[in-house]
Design a protein with these regions (language model features):
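Extended glycan-interaction surfaces of carbohydrate-active proteins
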Residues: 64-67, 225-268, 293-335, 381-423, ...
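Aromatic/His-enriched, Gly/Pro-containing loop or helix-boundary segments
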Residues: 71-83, 130-131, 161-163, 311-341, ...
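Beta-rich accessory regions
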Residues: 105, 174-176, 182, 441, ...
Length: 669
């Protein structure tokens, strides 16, 4: 059972208990540290059984519990309610109810413990290098950990009288007949440190009014009307989950950007935050501004092999845990990606097109120019004019620095893995798109027509060369990548779908690309696989080698739409949105790439993040795609092509440079 607020989250069992171990990664986490590894409730020394759980909201849950009666029948004379809310730390309202005709004496105990494990250590049970300490007074229990200047503390308190010890707190109760007892428990987290690249001080516990905040968030978003109830559920779930995944980096001045996903990626990720902001632009454009400003703040300035940092490079990942603080991991911050930098320029341009906010474009001109310069000055590792990647941090850096960042995601048709550097095809599309959009910004806002002309010339040349060098004539498809020798990595993969939304594909080749994407080797009926069936490494439950990723499909569908393949885009949208209904409206990070005719439902991927930011954003981009929404100067153009399963669809109060508008569409595809 999970509840979350930004990068603070709680994972517990069905009773609400936390018992962390290398095989049980439960706990209270904040800023990449587990602040609570034990939180176990007993009554008279016995654990409780679960009657039901209320998933009240993303930040709140309630557990209804009873003692073990020793029979299959629940005939308890006592029950317990735990109502929990998260926000920095967490708060738990604990209520014990006596249903008997006589008073009862009870010993209620909360065992509490903190291992202060780094998020990267929770599965390892590694021995900590610092020292644990505790302090007890009449009103609280403080548990702490310190390693040099790295300091984390958890403070536990109760509104009702209790006895604290270093392992928890105990209540000795006498509850009258048909009466109840309650207390409010607070678990507050704090962090104090000073490390090489970042300074963090103060408490992490914000205790905001999350319910009021969510209400305001939902009130600002467009209202959807349609005749498909499951789509209503998916739309609302997407907006709520996007609210849940918001967090405020300490550099963002209290404004929010999307964290990547629960549980392992509740942090700022350049690529994920950019793509999620792109997906959500027609619905919550304010996410994009915060994302752009935060990433601009952490843009690379020097050559640093440990962090894979270059001047102009956009950050990949920012962590606050112990391993980052002592550079056992390079994530404070880490720059090892090859796509976030061009995508930064893409988002900046798309943000202005939707909002008309030229102020941000002008303020971020130096960062955008630095990002564009990075493409030519640092990303062309092979000297052939293409963006490629090879980690300089051989010990802890990422090998694959494209979005498919697992070890086996880039392979030849026969399963061999290419040497580094690797130039994956979609990176070239992003670079092309960034240059074209950068040219528009330079000409319109930066008043530099010569620079705009140069970027346009570079983009045109890149498109010409790409359509020659990456094309596989025998397969009528684009290669997955070029290897270290400049030879084509000839596997068929979903990466070529991203070429469509970037616009780098010659129109004469687009039909062949779409034919592959919608063919039986890639399209399952639920969505497009990451790797085509028949390729040597294909596995329908392989992370990047056969599973279906909703975010991937949303951008592919958008690209199809941009090339005029509106019906095909609607089919992809229909498959993904059908799948969402089987996940109660919450699309996971990925699901199995099995043919739809084999299964009555999409097969779950066992370790998928959920909620996950760009999966949460996928239905939003698919709605934009189906309705054909495009900003055109000071108005929005609409060209709906909906799956026939959707009779009618309306979005009301879409925000943008035009104010707010309503759009409508009917299903015909």
């Amino acid at each position: 059972v999970s509840i979350l607020d930004g990068n603070t989250f709680v994972v517990s069992d069905q009773r609400g208990d936390i018992e962390a171990s290398p095989t049980d990664t439960s706990g209270l986490f904040s800023y990449d540290t587990r602040f609570l590894s034990t939180w176990v409730l007993t009554v008279n020394g016995e654990r409780l059984n679960t009657l039901s759980i209320d998933d009240l909201n993303y930040f709140e849950s309630r557990f209804f519990l009873v003692p073990d009666t020793g029979t299959v029948y629940v005939n308890a004379t006592m029950s317990v309610i735990r109502q929990r809310a998260v926000g920095g730390g967490f708060r738990e309202a604990l209520t014990v109810l006596n249903h008997a005709d006589e008073p009862v004496k009870l010993t209620v105990r909360i065992d509490a413990g903190c291992d202060f494990a780094d998020l990267f250590e929770v599965k390892d049970a590694a021995k900590k290098k610092g020292k644990y300490y505790h302090r007890i007074n009449h009103s609280s229990l403080l548990l702490g950990y310190q390693r040099e200047t790295f300091n984390r503390e958890t403070t536990i308190s109760s509104t009702a009288p209790c006895k604290y010890d270093e392992n928890g707190l105990t209540f000795e109760l006498r509850i009258g007949a048909h009466s109840e007892w309650s207390t409010d428990l607070t678990v507050a987290t704090s962090l104090v440190e000073e490390i090489s690249r970042q300074k963090v001080r103060g408490k992490a516990d914000r205790s905001p009014d999350l319910a009021a905040n969510l209400k305001k968030w939902m009130a600002r978003t467009p209202k959807m009307l349609c005749d498909v109830p499951s789509l209503d559920v998916t739309y609302e779930r997407s907006l709520v989950d996007l609210a849940a995944l918001r967090f405020s980096p300490r550099i963002a001045g209290g404004r929010s950007l999307p964290a990547a996903g629960l549980p392992w990626f509740m942090a700022m990720f350049g690529r994920d935050s950019i793509l999620t902001s792109l997906q959500a632009l027609p619905f919550v454009p304010e996410l994009a501004e915060t994302t752009l400003r935060a990433l601009a703040t952490w843009q690379g300035t020097v050559l640093d092999d440990f962090r894979d940092e270059d001047p102009g490079r956009i950050v990949h990942e920012m962590r606050y845990g112990e391993t980052a603080a002592f550079e056992e991991q390079p994530h404070s911050p880490y720059y090892g990606n090859a796509d976030a930098t061009p995508l930064f320029v893409v988002l900046l341009d798309e943000y202005e097109r939707w909002t008309g906010d030229s102020k941000v474009v002008k303020e971020l001109e130096p960062e955008a120019r630095a990002a564009l310069a990075w493409i030519d000055d640092y990303a062309d590792l092979q000297g052939n004019g293409y963006v490629s990647y090879k980690r300089r941090n051989e010990k802890t850096g990422l090998e694959n620095q494209c979005w498919k960042d697992s070890w086996d995601s880039i392979s030849y048709r026969d399963g061999r893995l290419p040497d580094f550097p690797r130039a994956t095809c979609e990176l070239q599309g992003y670079a092309y798109d960034a240059k074209m959009r950068g040219a528009r910004l330079a000409r319109t806002f930066w008043k530099d027509p010569a620079y705009a002309d140069e970027l346009t010339r570079q983009a045109t040349d890149l498109k010409r060369r790409f359509n020659q060098d990456f094309w596989l004539p025998d397969r009528q498809a684009f290669a997955l990548a070029l290897d270290a020798d400049g030879s084509k990595v000839d596997a068929l993969a979903s990466n070529m779908g991203h070429l469509l939304w970037s616009g780098i594909v010659d129109k004469a080749k687009a039909k062949a690309v779409v034919r592959h994407l919608m063919g039986p080797k890639l399209f399952t009926g639920w969505g497009i696989r990451t790797l085509a069936e028949g390729e040597a490494r294909f596995n329908p439950i392989g992370y990047h080698v056969g599973a279906v990723w909703p975010f991937d499909n949303s951008f592919i569908a958008w690209g199809m739409r941009n090339y005029g393949f509106k019906v095909e885009a609607a089919r992809v949208a229909a498959g993904i949105l059908d799948a969402a209904a089987f996940f109660r409206g919450r699309l996971p990070e990925a699901f199995g790439g099995y043919e739809r005719s084999y299964t009555m439902y999409p097969v779950e991927y066992p370790t998928a993040c959920s909620p996950q930011a760009w999966s949460t954003g996928a239905p939003l981009l698919l709605l934009r795609t189906m309705l054909g929404l495009e900003p055109t100067e000071d108005r929005i153009s609409v060209d709906p092509v909906l799956p026939k399963e959707i009779g009618h669809l309306a979005l009301l109060d879409i925000p943008g440079r035009w104010g707010r508008v309503d759009v409508y569409g009917r299903g015909r595809a």
